[in-house]
Amino acid sequence: MCIRDRNNSTTTTANISQKSLTASYTAENKVYDRNNTATVAGELSGVISGDQVSLSNASAVFSNKNVANNKTVTVSGLSISGTSSSNYALQNSIATTTANISPKSLIASFEASNKVYDRNTSAVVTHSINGVIDGDIISLENITANFSDKRAGNNKTVTVTSNISGADVSNYQLSNTTEL
């Protein structure tokens, strides 16, 4: 539509459409914590210098809670805010990236019992495991304990070996081998 005024100038109308923006994210690696939440940092592509537009309201989750490398992280609920945000349109409301969940370290504690000489090095130990997250199923197995030699004596070194087992074993690693 054209309109002329008395100065011989012409006016018309047209639209200014919102500029498209794309959000991309980088996820942080984490140690297993029994949940799938992820921490991410986002970046907008396409904002004109001097405009104030930022990403907001995003939540990020790993594909599941378990340990693995290059796990998919989905970022959803993306929106933009800021004084210039009405001039822009976010093209993606969901973004994906990858990150790692590494095993949580466990510490096994052992206490050796005294014994009477019996011509062998085998030892009896009591044990506990620290660091298992409530609700996960982990136990120590294949516990082997041996005195450094079979001779009678005080303050003898006992070497203990063991490994972990249970439904959640793939999310943990035993971080110590023990000499008592």
Which residue stretches match the model-derived regions?
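Short loop/turn motifs that initiate or flank beta-strands
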Residues: 4-180
